[in-house]
Regions:
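Short Cys/His-rich metal-coordination motifs, predominantly Zn2+-binding knuckles/fingers
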Residues: 66, 83, 97-101
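Short acidic, Pro/Gly- and aromatic-enriched capping/linker segments at domain boundaries
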Residues: 61-80, 368, 374
Length: 489
C-alpha cells in the first residue's frame, strides 16, 4: 500500500494538478475535469488493491508456518475484475509436502476459486444490473473500466442458489387478517430441453411457454401518503419461480414457513387468498390450513363483461342482476340469469362466450360470492399489476427467449430484489466458508517475526519510512491479522 501512495505522490498528484490547471483555463469544460479526477482516483484504487494482494502473497512466501507444510512451485499472473476495473497481480503456486497436491494459497485465504475472474463486489454489481436490464447491459455495468460477456452474466445467474428463510423471530406480529395474492407470468422459451425441440401447434404457434409463478403475502393496504389516492401494500413479501409439478408444494411450503416465522397464526382470524382460481393456486389450500379463497376483482369483472357486452344499453342492468345473484342468490338463480342472456345472443360465438364465462364463475362460486359479500375485510387483488411489475417488465414485456433454468433463476432473483435483498449478501451466500484452524485467531506472533517484518519494510521503503509516523503499528496489525489466516491453511 505504501508504494502505491508513494507513486501517487510522485506522479498522480502532478496529473491532478494538470487536470485542475486545464479546468481553470476552461471552467466550462466541467465534464473533462470530473472525468480526469475520476480516472486518477480509480487508477490509485486499482494500484492499492494490486499492491495489497501482492503483499499478502509475499507474507505467504515468507511465512515459517507455511513452510512447514507447503513448498513454492512457481509464481503466476492473475487477473481479477472488480467493480473499479481489472486488477493484474502475481500469486504463488504451492505444493503440499505430504499430499503433493498444488494450490494457490492466496486464493484459499481470499475465499475465491482458482479460475474465478470476478470479485464478489463485481458479481454483486452484475446481479444488481441483470435483475433490471439485459445480460449484455449487466456485463457492461459490472465494472467502471472493464466489462464481462453476456455469457458470463448468464452463467452466474444459472448457478445462483437462494438463501433459506431466516430463523424464527423472537416476537411474531399479531394481526387479524393476512392476504395472499397469486398469479403467473407466461414466459417464452428458446427451447425446452435442447435447441430445436419446440413443437408447433395447429395454429402455427410454437408451444414454448413456461409459467413463472408469483405469490406475495401482505397485511393489508394503506395510502402512500395522508392525502394520496394511491395505495400500497403493507409489509409485502414475494415468492417466485417456476415450481413445476411436485415442486408446486415446495412453493406453498415456503409461503407457510414465512407466515409461521413472522406472524402469530393463532391470532389471525382469516387468511384470504386472492387469485383467479388456477389449479396450482388452489393447491395452496392443501398446504396452508384455514385459507379462504377469493376470486380476484379483475377476473370477476372480466367474465361479467364477456357475458353482458352484447346488450348495449342494458349492460349495467344485466351486470347488476348477475352480481345480485352471485352475492345473495344460489347457483340456480345465477344459471337462470345466464340462460336469459343466452337468449339475447345474436350469434353462436356470443352464446358460447356467455356459456364459458358462466361456467368459470360457477366453478369459482364460493370465491366469487366472498368477493362481493365481504367487502370490509376483503381487499382488492393487485396480482395482475404485480405480475407486470415484478416479472413481466424484465421477462416477457419485450421479445425475449429464455431457458427453463433462466426463467426460474430470474424469477427468484426478481422476488429477492423486490424483497429488498442485498445482492452482495446473496453473492456471499454462494461461497463455501473455508475452515480456520482452531486457535489460529489467537495466535501471537513472536518478537522475532515482528522485527523481521519491520526490517523488511524499512529496507524496502528507505527514506519514506519516516514520512508516515503511524505506519509501524498499522503494518504490524496487518501482519498479525493475515498470519492468523495462514495458520488456518
Amino acid at each position: 500500500m505504501i508504494k502505491s501512495i508513494q507513486q501517487f505522490e510522485e506522479s498522480g498528484i502532478k496529473k491532478l494538478e494538470k487536470i485542475i490547471e486545464s479546468f481553470m483555463k476552461d471552467p466550462k469544460d466541467m465534464a473533462s475535469f470530473v472525468y480526469g479526477i475520476r480516472d486518477e482516483v480509480i487508477a490509485l484504487g486499482l494500484d492499492l488493491i494490486k499492491e495489497t494482494l501482492e503483499d499478502c502473497n509475499q507474507m505467504l512466501c515468507d511465512s515459517a508456518k507455511r513452510k512447514q507444510s507447503w513448498e513454492v512451485v512457481r509464481t503466476d499472473g492473475k487477473k481479477l475484475t472488480t467493480c473499479l476495473g481489472t486488477v493484474c497481480f502475481e500469486k504463488t503456486l504451492f505444493r503440499n509436502k505430504q499430499t503433493r497436491k498444488t494450490a494457490y494459497l492466496l486464493d484459499r485465504i481470499l475465499g475465491i476459486e482458482s479460475h474465478e475472474r470476478l470479485t464478489e463486489d463485481a458479481e454483486a454489481k452484475l446481479l444488481e444490473e441483470a435483475v433490471q436490464t439485459s445480460y449484455r447491459k449487466a456485463g457492461e455495468e459490472t465494472s467502471l473500466t472493464d466489462r464481462v460477456s453476456k455469457q458470463t452474466v448468464k452463467n452466474k445467474l444459472h448457478r445462483l442458489t437462494f438463501p433459506q428463510l431466516e430463523e424464527t423471530k423472537p416476537e411474531k406480529k399479531a394481526v387479524e387478517f393476512l392476504y395472499i395474492d397469486a398469479d403467473e407470468d407466461h414466459v417464452s422459451l428458446q427451447f425446452k430441453e435442447k435447441k430445436g425441440d419446440l413443437e408447433v401447434g395447429e395454429n402455427n404457434w410454437k408451444n414454448n411457454c413456461v409459467l413463472a409463478k408469483l405469490v406475495y403475502v401482505y397485511e393489508g393496504i394503506e395510502p402512500e401518503s395522508p392525502k394520496s389516492k394511491r395505495h400500497k401494500l403493507v409489509n409485502p413479501h414475494y415468492f417466485s419461480g417456476v415450481y413445476e409439478g411436485a415442486d408446486n408444494a415446495k412453493l406453498w411450503d415456503e409461503v407457510y414457513a414465512y407466515l409461521d416465522s413472522h406472524y402469530d397464526l393463532k391470532k389471525v382470524k382469516k387468511i384470504y387468498l386472492n387469485a383467479d382460481g388456477g389449479t396450482w393456486i388452489q393447491s395452496g389450500k392443501k398446504r396452508i390450513a384455514g385459507i379462504t379463497s377469493v376470486l380476484d376483482e379483475f377476473h370477476l369483472q372480466k367474465y361479467l363483461l364477456k357475458m353482458t357486452s352484447h346488450l348495449k344499453d342494458s349492460v349495467d342492468d344485466a351486470r347488476k342482476e348477475l352480481c345480485d345473484a352471485i352475492k345473495s342468490g344460489t347457483k340456480a338463480d345465477f344459471q337462470e340469469v345466464v340462460e336469459r342472456l343466452k337468449v339475447c345472443a345474436e350469434t353462436e360465438a356470443t352464446e358460447k362466450r356467455i356459456e364459458e364465462s358462466g361456467s368459470y364463475i360457477l366453478s369459482n362460486w364460493t370465491a366469487a360470492k366472498i368477493r362481493l359479500k365481504d367487502r370490509e375485510t376483503v381487499k382488492g387483488c393487485s396480482a395482475e399489476g404485480h405480475v407486470s411489475h415484478v416479472l413481466s417488465s424484465r421477462m416477457s414485456s419485450r421479445p425475449m427467449g429464455w431457458s427453463r433454468t433462466g426463467v426460474d433463476k430470474m424469477a427468484h432473483l426478481r422476488a429477492y430484489y423486490w424483497n429488498g435483498g442485498d445482492m452482495l449478501e446473496l453473492v456471499r451466500q454462494q461461497e463455501q466458508e473455508l475452515p480456520v484452524a482452531a486457535g489460529a485467531e489467537n495466535e501471537v506472533l513472536s518478537c522475532e517475526s515482528i522485527l523481521r517484518w519491520e526490517r523488511h519494510r524499512h529496507n524496502k521503503l528507505g527514506k519514506y519510512i519516516e514520512s508516515i509516523n503511524h505506519s509501524v503499528s498499522t503494518e504490524v496489525k496487518k501482519y498479525a491479522w493475515f498470519n492468523a489466516h495462514i495458520w488456518g491453511l
